Amino acid sequence: MTTEKFKILSEYIKDMSSETPNIQTYLFVKDSISKYHLNIEITSEALKNKVIEVNTSLKFLDKDSSEKKATFEMTYSSVIKIEDEIKDKKILQKIILCDVQNKIYPKLEKAFLNMLTNSGYPDIAF
């Protein structure tokens, strides 16, 4: 087993939003939410001394042209420290895009599903 080449210093929900404009939209979305799509975007920003902020954004939305839509978004931020010997850009990309994501996914998924449940849309799984 290989040792991790990074350490998560901190992680938190940076932004979270659930919008259902009215009861008609809620009733419509409740029946059509299975058609919604989950988009994932990962960005990173070097801070200092091998410390990087990794933002993982989830957007759960209707791709159809329906007028009755609800939107659900969350940005989960992880602050990581990379080992000093990491110089290769491909290794750094793998850490940010794969390794960090695998590590944070259980918390990220739980927070996002809790938001959906608390917004009136239980029993959704990814």
Name what the model sees in each region.
Residues 1-126:
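N-terminal intrinsically disordered, cationic/polar leader segments
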